[in-house]
């Protein structure tokens, strides 16, 4: 476990970070020699990383595996050994130049097939999504229609058959039309004779209605606070005594005459 951690740190620092900074310096200085050197290093290191993916799975149990890997990375990077340039010139460049046309043809075919597969996959995914949306919409519509039908049937069954009772407000009896009793011999829905057609309503046939009370206007705030002044009542005894006195005064005048 310790060797694995040390190996990962060595590969990260000496295999990636330092070569990346050195490549930046080569591009900035426009030194063709350094540029070619670091390009060869990155090609060899990419092949090493691809091979490491499989060797870590199958050969990691081999003793001193991580120590050999650290030593190999340092050998590639060292300016004294120049392991990256040596491997590139001896093995990588000849093999790539030998199979260059085949590699290019495979890349072109892979591009075309990947484009076609992406189009077909996109069409299939769109068709599947559209069919799923249509099925979901139909199912939801059917479920909603069934639910609405069940609710409507329940509502219709819950409506009572009894007529709604009418109520009369005793405060507004004058607004209502007085009802009259039908004449004697009247049959609802039947034909009336010639004698019954000429009959008129009599006064005693009208249903007596209670007397209508005039609506009293509500008192205002100022009127409710006023004090009602009443006139003093005149006594009947005083008026009669005045009449007797006038008669007594009138009698001596008659005697003198």
Swiss-Prot record:
GO terms for biological process: cell division; mitotic nuclear membrane reassembly; nuclear envelope organization. One of its GO terms (molecular function) is microtubule binding. The modification Phosphoserine is found at residues 152, 194, 202, 253. It is a multi-pass membrane protein. Pfam families: TB2_DP1_HVA22 (PF03134). Residues 177-257 are annotated as: Disordered. InterPro entries: TB2_DP1_HVA22. It comes from the Eukaryota. The modification Phosphothreonine is found at residue 196. It is found in: Endoplasmic reticulum membrane. Microtubule-binding protein required to ensure proper cell division and nuclear envelope reassembly by sequestering the endoplasmic reticulum away from chromosomes during mitosis. Probably acts by clearing the endoplasmic reticulum membrane from metaphase chromosomes. Belongs to the DP1 family. This is Receptor expression-enhancing protein 4. The lineage of its organism: Eukaryota, Metazoa, Chordata, Craniata, Vertebrata. The gene is Reep4.
